[in-house]
Structures are given as structure tokens and as C-alpha cells.
Amino acid sequence: MRLILCWLGIWIFCVGLFAQNTKDNSSFLFDEFQDCLIVYKDGRQFTAPVNYDLIKKHYVFKDPEQQEKEFSDPELIAVLRIGNRSFLIGKQEAVEVIQAQPKFNVIYTGDTRRAPKKISYGGTTQTASVDNYSGLTGTGLSGGIQDAQRIVTGINKTYEVGVGKKTKRFYNKKSFLKLFPKKQQVRWNRYIEENKIDFGSVDQVFKLFQVSISH
């Protein structure tokens, strides 16, 4: 009986570990590709399923054949609208606009580590026109070797805010307090502790920012 329970415990542990690793191995910001309105700076608009690759650090879309492709000219894109959310093309980072003025953006990056060794596979990179999307073009993604080297274990959030005429960033309590003179840091440290602010929660941090700029 004890032996059976022992094997049962090992089996449950292995199943849980497999499920966890499967989830961790996703390299994308969203669990699934999202319907997106892609607005270019020259006024052109397209729709396509879009996601953000946290390892390769760029947005990807699916063409009509469900092939994942990178945007050919990402610098020409003004905004990506996913539902009621707006994203910008950052420098190797996904940037969500929560508020335009005063600025409050959330920057998403992947926390990665080396993947377990396994046989890599190859692929080719080529540029192709997506006719079904009325001119939306992309570059085919090379698969395998780069993806096999690292996996995403978590998603980091960095907050980019407008403070006066400057733009500053913070990601935890310590870096947030540095936005203020030392005399004010004690007060805001107490506020954070009393309200149990979780810097992983965009809603809580946004409310904290709004309170801080109103005083």
C-alpha cells in the first residue's frame, strides 16, 4: 500500500511538472493570438491575429495560411489596437498605453532562462506579401535554433511615466520611491505598505500613480 501511494505521489508530481513546463515554454505575451487592428502612421489600417514574442522581442502576426510572420516595417506602425487596449512598437519590448497624459505606459519583457537541450530544427527567412490583408507584409520567422535556446519563465512589468517634463521608469517599490525627494519617500513608503500595493498589478500601480501626482 505504501509503495502504491509512493508511485502515485511521483506520478502526480511529474504530471504537475509537465503541465508547468508546458505553460512556461510559451514564448508569447498572450495565451492566444489576439484580433488586432494595425494602424500605420500614414493612415493605412489592417486586421490580423497578433501576439508578442517575448524571446525574439518583436510582434508577430498570422497570415491567411496561419503562418507566423514578423512585420516588415514595424517602425511605420503607429499603434496596435487589441480590443480596448493600445500597444506601441517599442525597442525590443511591448509597450501598452494606459494613459496618454500624463504618460503611463506598461512595458512587458520576458524573464527567460536556458531551455533543456534538445534537437534543434532549421528554417528559412523570407519576405512575403499577405494579399488577403490588402498589402500587409511580413517576414517569415526562422524556427528552431534560437527558440530552442531559451524559454520564458515569467513576464516582467516596467512602468514608464511622465513626471513633469521628464519620462521615468520604475518596476518595484524601491524604484518608485526614487521618483520623489527623500523627504517624501517616507510618506509614500507608508502609503504603499498600508495599502499593500502589488507592483505586479497594473491597476493598483496606476491608481498609486494617480494619487501621487494629485498631491
Question: What feature does the model see in each segment?
Answer:
Residues 1-25, 208:
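Bacterial Sec-dependent N-terminal signal peptides
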Residues 16, 35, 58:
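Exposed beta-strand and adjacent loop surfaces of beta-rich binding modules
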Residues 17, 133-136, 179:
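Short, aromatic- and cysteine-enriched interfacial helices/patches
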Residues 20, 214-215:
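Short, solvent-exposed mixed-charge patches
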Residues 21-39:
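Short N-terminal segments immediately surrounding and downstream of signal-peptide cleavage
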Residues 145-200, 204-209, 214:
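A short, solvent-exposed beta-edge/loop patch
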